[in-house]
Regions:
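C-terminal binding/interaction regions
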Residues: 4-5, 10-19, 94-133
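A short beta-strand-loop structural module common to alpha/beta enzyme folds
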Residues: 34-45
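Short, structured active-site "lid" loops
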Residues: 51-73
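Glycine-rich phosphate/diphosphate-binding loop of Rossmann-like nucleotide-binding domains
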Residues: 10-30, 35
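Short hydrophobic/aromatic-enriched beta-strand-loop microsegments
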Residues: 87-94
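Short Gly/Thr/Asp-enriched flexible loops that form oxyanion-binding sites at enzyme active sites
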Residues: 76-87
Length: 133
């Protein structure tokens, strides 16, 4: 398992995942994380597949060790990110699965679906995923 050496993370969302991404981003920033947001403006967010591929590229190019991706179900953005070499993406809907995705499966990108994951749960999932060694 690759540990996170820095408190830097990249995030991105399509229109459906945007509000959840914003909640998680604020939460992480309050906890001292430096969050790079590839989709900072709702009206300018691309479709899920473009966001997923962009997030994956950030990991593949070595700019970030971990990424958080948000769309309606988490599945579409996960599929797109998984097409990028060196990306090991996981779709999770619970804190234990997010923790295990990182710790046991060496996932480096966590995808969440805003249709199924509430903001507080998403915050706890992000914490578990990013803290997992």
């Amino acid at each position: 398992m690759k540990t996170v050496r820095s408190k830097n993370v990249v995030v991105g969302a399509d229109f459906a995942g945007f509000p959840l991404k914003e909640a998680v981003k604020r939460h992480l920033e309050e906890r001292g994380w430096t969050v790079t947001d590839l989709t900072p403006v709702l009206e300018e967010t691309p479709m899920y597949h473009r966001v997923g591929f962009s997030l994956g590229a950030q990991i593949a190019e070595g700019r970030f060790e971990r990424a958080l991706a948000f769309c309606g179900t988490g599945m579409g953005i996960h599929i797109a990110a998984s097409k990028v070499p060196h990306v090991h993406a996981a779709v999770c809907e619970s804190v234990p699965s997010a923790r295990r995705a990182s710790a046991a499966n060496n996932a480096n990108l966590l995808a969440m679906g805003a249709f199924y994951v509430a903001p507080r749960t998403a915050m706890a999932m992000a914490d578990a995923f990013l803290a997992s060694e």
